[in-house]
Amino acid sequence: MDTREAVHAAARRARTASRVLALLTTAQKDAALHAAADAVLAASADILAANAADIETARASGTEDSLLDRLRLTPERIEGIASGLRQVAGLPDPVGEVVRGSTLPNGLELRQLRVPLGVVGMVYEARPNVTVDAFGLALKSGNAALLRGSSSAAKSNAALVVALRTSLAAQQLPEDAVQLLPSDDRSSVTHLIQARGLVDVVIPRGGAGLISAVVRDATVPTIETGVGNCHVYVHSAADLEMAERILLNSKTRRPSVCNTAETVLIDAAIAETAVPKLLQALQTHSVTVHGDLPGLVPATESDWSEEYLTLDVALKVVDDLNAAVEHIDRYGTGHTEAIVTSDLAAAREFTARVDAAAVMVNASTAFTDGEQFGFGAEIGISTQKLHARGPMGLPELTSTKWIVWGDGHTRPV
């Protein structure tokens, strides 16, 4: 069987499984999620051993520390993965929710209900936790998950999927509700994203190159996620102590994730005081600052659009709020933008004008996260406007169906 047929066969099995999942009760899905969490914890030794092998291979090939951090699993991270499954079990089930409804003058009763999408394909890099996050959210929303991880996490992903499939079988549910496509054949991505009619949506998570390639080449509908050139704008009315805390948290908490700040914009009206203070704070935390000011790494045009994902940040002094918004419009990726200010009018103008999935006022960009938003584990952070935007939880993994109840109604000629 060639790769194309293998992917299509997996998609057909996923379709069959999805029909079973769509009819499960909330209690059945929640029980399956708790069983999956138990299975992941029970298999933690095997999962950690597989991950150690992936880490060793990646390190030997010269993988950067930021990418190793994305790849690495620890006992604490496995506990977090299991906890994420339990959190999803505790979330409201979107399937069957009435979005809107009415009774027409002729007596027909209309209801628009949430229903599963069907087969959800995921193409993702490095992070093995995405394997379980995708499974958990897909299962709770009644979808089958068809996963294509990166070769760098092949052993980790395989160990996780073995645990998940074992738990499904123990619950007498179809194991093909989650399948892992081969990561050693690049063509499997192409065949997945072009399996129109077999796969309902593909969600890419990873670097800009992966995401743009999937969106460009797919014939299956896609949801673009993740590339985050996020800005923190320190307004002229900012509390500089607050600005320092927010900037450091946005940049240094986990620099390898997509909601990290990559550029800080400082209002010219306070630059004389703000620049030295914020520079010292950043440099104390080992952040390399790129910019046009003396003593910084000279910035090039590419720095303003760079998603570093490292302890690097670009710094620019801007004339005012209008200039900050124009800079963000030009270089931002529509992910998360933040303003630090005590001026309510300025905050409202910033939130109204900035075009992004999330806009923060006096808060770290790190809060753009499904768990932080109360969604549980997220399937990704959408930076497009259709079909979802921002952190994608359970409702974003559903479509809708119109149910019309009549009593012998016929439409007049």
Curated annotation (Swiss-Prot):
A Gene Ontology term for the protein's cellular component: cytoplasm
CDD domains the record matches: ALDH_F18-19_ProA-GPR
Signal sequence region: none
Known catalytic reactions: L-glutamate 5-semialdehyde + phosphate + NADP(+) = L-glutamyl 5-phosphate + NADPH + H(+)
SUPFAM superfamilies (UniProt xref): ALDH-like
Subcellular compartments: Cytoplasm
Record-linked InterPro entries: Ald_DH/histidinol_DH, Ald_DH_C, Ald_DH_N, Aldehyde_DH_dom, G-glutamylP_reductase_CS, Glu-5-SA_DH, GPR_dom
Keywords assigned: Amino-acid biosynthesis, Cytoplasm, NADP, Oxidoreductase, Proline biosynthesis
Role played: Catalyzes the NADPH-dependent reduction of L-glutamate 5-phosphate into L-glutamate 5-semialdehyde and phosphate. The product spontaneously undergoes cyclization to form 1-pyrroline-5-carboxylate.
Name of the featured protein: Gamma-glutamyl phosphate reductase
Provenance organism: Rhodococcus jostii (strain RHA1)
